Amino acid sequence: MSKGKVLLVLYEGGKHAEEQEKLLGCIENELGIRNFIEEQGYELVTTIDKDPEPTSTVDRELKDAEIVITTPFFPAYISRNRIAEAPNLKLCVTAGVGSDHVDLEAANERKITVTEVTGSNVVSVAEHVMATILVLIRNYNGGHQQAINGEWDIAGVAKNEYDLEDKIISTVGAGRIGYRVLERLVAFNPKKLLYYDYQELPAEAINRLNEASKLFNGRGDIVQRVEKLEDMVAQSDVVTINCPLHKDSRGLFNKKLISHMKDGAYLVNTARGAICVAEDVAEAVKSGKLAGYGGDVWDKQPAPKDHPWRTMDNKDHVGNAMTVHISGTSLDAQKRYAQGVKNILNSYFSKKFDYRPQDIIVQNGSYATRAYGQKK
């Protein structure tokens, strides 16, 4: 008889899982933790069937589960209703970063611990942010389409192509990912790096960026915190979103806020899709208010085939730099968050509950972080 049930919800790898054994984040490879869990005397149940609620396999198996593990890339939404139907549930683990798919208020009410593997994919996401910015501002899509279509119209590409140098670039959120984006942007000699966050960056972190810019670019004091979001986006050539999804950030980038942005600015979102209002963003790209929008996160995942971000574009057909949700799930990141999940489970199974403080989102009925719009 097992001590309890662990429910693991991951995306299907299919033939790709057979071809690549490092693809730990798929259901076939189970984060590499099956043997570990079973050695602890627990049962591991895996599924890809997470929707619709309340008739999915997740709903059925969660009813008597003690632990649920899911991922931001293929999230099983642990809603208030699902929590209410799961009396044995004690621990929710996010294989990756970002636990907005869990109803944190309901988890607090039930004193369910919610954890994630903080830091496991921050570099991966920051690199994807940089790639997306460059795809948009350098009009990579326009040039690539000509290359594969047998065309050669230099002016048709160059008319929408710019450098990052001397641009004002900003981030909404300057935490582990946002700061790494700022670090990488210094190399492009920006005019200014702006950030909007509930707290100021440590002086040492700001000085490091300013000193690097002065050393390599001859331009110091480029980093500035802006306290009003409308003021920041109004002066930015590129805006990147690197903050968690919570009640105050949901729908933050809507028609009203976008109206404050520079005409022809670029918007990049690898945080959470629901931070942006999909229809408002698509319309801004179509009208040319935004020169382009890119990222990998969607307000519903998997995104429906008719999602407006799949087909949004501008008149030159170069305003869309969307991908599926891949920024934080490189093979290197998968190795890190798989190990992190194992470490969290080990803390739970040993009854030490000595989780890394930065991995705890809610515990013992209260928030352990301000990242989700809550104070300690």
Swiss-Prot record:
<feature type="binding site">
    <location>
        <position position="97"/>
    </location>
    <ligand>
        <name>substrate</name>
    </ligand>
</feature>
<feature type="binding site">
    <location>
        <position position="270"/>
    </location>
    <ligand>
        <name>NAD(+)</name>
    </ligand>
</feature>
<dbReference type="InterPro" id="IPR036291">
    <property type="entry name" value="NAD(P)-bd_dom_sf"/>
</dbReference>
<comment type="function">
    <text>Catalyzes the NAD(+)-dependent oxidation of formate to carbon dioxide. Formate oxidation is the final step in the methanol oxidation pathway in methylotrophic microorganisms. Has a role in the detoxification of exogenous formate in non-methylotrophic organisms.</text>
</comment>
<dbReference type="InterPro" id="IPR029753">
    <property type="entry name" value="D-isomer_DH_CS"/>
</dbReference>
<dbReference type="GO" id="GO:0008863">
    <property type="term" value="F:formate dehydrogenase (NAD+) activity"/>
</dbReference>
<dbReference type="GO" id="GO:0005829">
    <property type="term" value="C:cytosol"/>
</dbReference>
<dbReference type="InterPro" id="IPR033689">
    <property type="entry name" value="FDH_NAD-dep"/>
</dbReference>
<dbReference type="Pfam" id="PF02826">
    <property type="entry name" value="2-Hacid_dh_C"/>
</dbReference>
<comment type="similarity">
    <text>Belongs to the D-isomer specific 2-hydroxyacid dehydrogenase family. FDH subfamily.</text>
</comment>
<keyword id="KW-0963">Cytoplasm</keyword>
<dbReference type="GO" id="GO:0016616">
    <property type="term" value="F:oxidoreductase activity, acting on the CH-OH group of donors, NAD or NADP as acceptor"/>
</dbReference>
<protein>
    <recommendedName>
        <fullName>Formate dehydrogenase 1</fullName>
        <ecNumber>1.17.1.9</ecNumber>
    </recommendedName>
</protein>
<dbReference type="InterPro" id="IPR006139">
    <property type="entry name" value="D-isomer_2_OHA_DH_cat_dom"/>
</dbReference>
<feature type="binding site">
    <location>
        <position position="197"/>
    </location>
    <ligand>
        <name>NAD(+)</name>
    </ligand>
</feature>
<feature type="binding site">
    <location>
        <begin position="244"/>
        <end position="248"/>
    </location>
    <ligand>
        <name>NAD(+)</name>
    </ligand>
</feature>
<comment type="subunit">
    <text>Homodimer.</text>
</comment>
<dbReference type="GO" id="GO:0051287">
    <property type="term" value="F:NAD binding"/>
</dbReference>
<keyword id="KW-0520">NAD</keyword>
<feature type="binding site">
    <location>
        <position position="121"/>
    </location>
    <ligand>
        <name>substrate</name>
    </ligand>
</feature>
<feature type="site" description="Important for catalytic activity">
    <location>
        <position position="325"/>
    </location>
</feature>
<feature type="binding site">
    <location>
        <begin position="176"/>
        <end position="177"/>
    </location>
    <ligand>
        <name>NAD(+)</name>
    </ligand>
</feature>
<dbReference type="InterPro" id="IPR006140">
    <property type="entry name" value="D-isomer_DH_NAD-bd"/>
</dbReference>
<feature type="binding site">
    <location>
        <begin position="325"/>
        <end position="328"/>
    </location>
    <ligand>
        <name>NAD(+)</name>
    </ligand>
</feature>
<feature type="site" description="Important for catalytic activity">
    <location>
        <position position="272"/>
    </location>
</feature>
<keyword id="KW-0560">Oxidoreductase</keyword>
<dbReference type="GO" id="GO:0042183">
    <property type="term" value="P:formate catabolic process"/>
</dbReference>
<feature type="binding site">
    <location>
        <position position="296"/>
    </location>
    <ligand>
        <name>NAD(+)</name>
    </ligand>
</feature>
<dbReference type="Pfam" id="PF00389">
    <property type="entry name" value="2-Hacid_dh"/>
</dbReference>
